[in-house]
C-alpha cells in the first residue's frame, strides 16, 4: 500500500479544512496552516497546521474531508486574480488526483487480497507437495531399470539356452549319425552272422554226410572183412601145410585205425574251426551289442536333456512374455501417472504465468501510481510555495497594519 504525507508549516490567509473542520481567522487569533496526510486508498486524509498569531479579521472556511474541493475565501486584496484561479485549479486537480489515488489503491488492495486468497487456495500445501511423487517416480524408474536389466539377463540366458540347445542338437545329430552308422554295421554283422549260420548249417550237413559216409565205409569194411575172413577160413582148411600168408586182419585193422584217425582229425579240425568262428562271431556280436546299448543309453540321455532344455526354453519364453507384459503394464500405468503429473505441472505453470502476468500488471499500475504520486507531490510543492508566498504577503500586511 502507498501512503504519503505532507506537513504544511506555513501560515495562509484563508484555507478550507480537509476534515470538515473550520479554519478561523481573527484579530489576534490563531491561524493553522494545513498539511496533508494521505492514507492508503485516499482514506483517512487529514490536515494538520501550525499556529501563527494573526491580527486580521476572522472568518470561517469549511471544506470536505479528503479533498480540497471547498471554496477558498479570503479578504479582498489578499490574493490576486491569477493566484486565485491557480489555487482553485490546484485544488481541483489535487481532489481529482486524490480520487484517482484512492481508486487505484483500493483496486490494488483488492488485487492483493485476491492474490493472497488465490495463494491460500492454490498455493503449494501438503496436498500440493510433489516431492513424494518425485521419490515414487525415481523408485519406479529404478524398478523399470532393474526390470529392464533383469529382462536383458533373461534374454541373455535365453540366448545361452538357445545356443546350448543348438549345441546339443548338433551333438544329437552327430550321435544319431553315429547310431545310424552303428546300426548299418550291425545290419552288416547280421548279414555276416546269417552267412556264418548258413556256413555252419552247411558244415553240419557236411559233418552228417561224412558221418554217413563213415558209417557206410565202416559197414563196407566190415562186410569186406567178413568176406575176407570167410575166404581166409576156406583157404586155411584147404591148404593146411602151405606157408603162412599175409595177416589181412591186421592190415585191415591198421587201415581202419588210420582211416578213423583221419576222420577224427578232420572232424576235430572242422569242429575247432566252427567253434572258433562261432566264438569270434559271438565276441563281435557281444561287442557291438554293448556298443549299441551304450549308444542307446547316450541317445536316451541326449533326448532327455533335449526335452529338459526345450521345457526350460518354454519356461524362459513364458517368463520373458510375462515380464514383458508386466513391464508394458508398469510403463503404461506409470506413464499415465506421469502424464497426469505433467498435466498438473503444466496447469500450475499456467497459473504461475497468470500470477506473474497479474504481478507485472500490478507493478505497472503501481509505477503509474508512483508517477501520479510524484506529480502530486510536485503540485503540492507548488501549492506550498504559493501558500508560503501568500503567508509572506499576509505577514507584510499584518506588519503594515501594526505600524
Curated annotation (Swiss-Prot):
Residues 229-251 are annotated as: Linker 12. The modification Asymmetric dimethylarginine is found at residue 24. Residues 83-394 form the IF rod domain. InterPro entries: IF_conserved, IF_rod_dom, Keratin_I. Residues 252-390 are annotated as: Coil 2. Expressed in brain, heart, skin and in costameres of myoplasm at the sarcolemmal membrane in skeletal and cardiac muscle fibers. Undifferentiated gonads and somatic cells of ovarian cords throughout the fetal ovary development. Keywords: Coiled coil, Intermediate filament, Keratin, Methylation, Phosphoprotein. Heterotetramer of two type I and two type II keratins. Interacts with PNN. Interacts with the actin-binding domain of DMD. This is Keratin, type I cytoskeletal 19.
